[in-house]
């Protein structure tokens, strides 16, 4: 009789202990999941455009800038063949410092070719470079800066040239996917303003992994990038907000299009506001580009 009571007490004890353990485990898992979501939301990535091909000769200069601005992605202009050995060392150094490196390439006229011939030829060079390099020396992806919309042809017939551009980019993206290259595309903030929203959606859905919007609309960035943000979230694409830092007058830039006189801190505040507005996606914060940004930092240090 006593042994039965003892067994019952033990059963109740282990049953209660099991319930407590399960409850504790569920709380722990729930807490971890919550922390994971919170960390995911606040995770910040920052990119830098580099248009000087010779920059690959001085990886320490890139590292210095990257450390100062907490850069996690570097978009380096290259054709995949020039200064290949310097490029390999450059990419390796940045990778060793947890910075992803994308090959930056593109030209206006590439976007006129429906068959994507020129784009494919340049992507092939990047693929060959990667095949001939060690894992640490390989590009993580490509940043395609192809801007056919600035041509007179486009202005005369935007629908036709948008179709050509989309055809070109689809072929490039298919090739990049086949060869394990992440693809980011630079686009202006105004395709929807031109009545080309359907084409914009097709671009985002079918031609890239990442959408890098040249959001040169100081003070109106949140509204200007709204369509792209909605479509990026819809199709699971990463969204970049590129801000301009070149001086007023360069390439016709106005005070309303560049942060040159507003300062880097002001730009950071803009990125923060964008992230708060579009909280369901991580907005990658891109500086355009290294040369004017360095000048601004030097001017700030001199004050």
Predicted features and spans:
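Active-site groove signature of glycoside hydrolases
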Residues: 126-161, 282-286
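Short, acidic/polar
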Residues: 52-67, 117-132, 193-204, 224-225, ...
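Glycoside hydrolase catalytic-domain groove-lining segments
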Residues: 170, 181, 213-252
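C-terminal motif of bacterial Sec signal peptides marking the signal peptidase cleavage site
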Residues: 29-31
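Aromatic- and acid-rich polysaccharide-binding/catalytic face
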Residues: 71, 76, 197-224
């Amino acid at each position: 009789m006593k042994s039965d009571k003892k067994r019952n007490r033990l059963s109740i004890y282990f049953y209660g202990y099991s319930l407590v353990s399960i409850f504790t485990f569920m709380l722990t898992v729930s807490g971890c999941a919550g922390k994971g979501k919170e960390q995911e939301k606040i995770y910040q990535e920052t990119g830098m455009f580099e248009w000087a091909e010779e920059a690959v000769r001085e990886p320490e200069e890139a590292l210095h800038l990257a450390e100062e601005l907490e850069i996690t992605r570097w978009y380096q202009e290259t054709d995949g063949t020039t200064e290949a050995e310097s490029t390999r060392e450059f990419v390796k150094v940045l990778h060793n410092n947890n910075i992803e490196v994308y090959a930056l390439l593109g030209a206006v006229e590439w976007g006129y070719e429906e068959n994507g011939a020129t784009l494919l030829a340049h992507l092939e060079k990047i693929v060959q470079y990667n095949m001939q390099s060690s894992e640490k020396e390989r590009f993580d992806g490509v940043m395609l800066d192809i801007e056919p919309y600035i041509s007179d042809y486009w202005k005369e017939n935007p629908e036709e040239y948008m179709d050509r551009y989309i055809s070109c980019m689809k072929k490039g993206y298919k090739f990049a996917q086949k060869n394990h290259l992440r693809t980011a595309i630079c686009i202006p903030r105004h395709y929807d303003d031109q009545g080309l929203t359907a084409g914009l959606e097709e671009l985002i859905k079918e031609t890239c992994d990442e959408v890098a919007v040249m959001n040169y609309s100081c003070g109106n960035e949140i509204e200007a990038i709204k369509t792209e943000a909605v479509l990026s979230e819809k199709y699971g694409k990463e969204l970049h907000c590129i801000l301009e830092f070149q001086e007023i007058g360069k390439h016709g830039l106005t005070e309303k299009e560049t942060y040159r006189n507003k300062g880097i801190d002001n730009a950071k505040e803009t990125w923060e506001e964008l992230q708060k507005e579009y909280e369901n996606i991580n907005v990658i914060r891109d500086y355009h580009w290294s040369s004017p940004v360095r000048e601004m930092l030097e001017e700030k240090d001199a004050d």
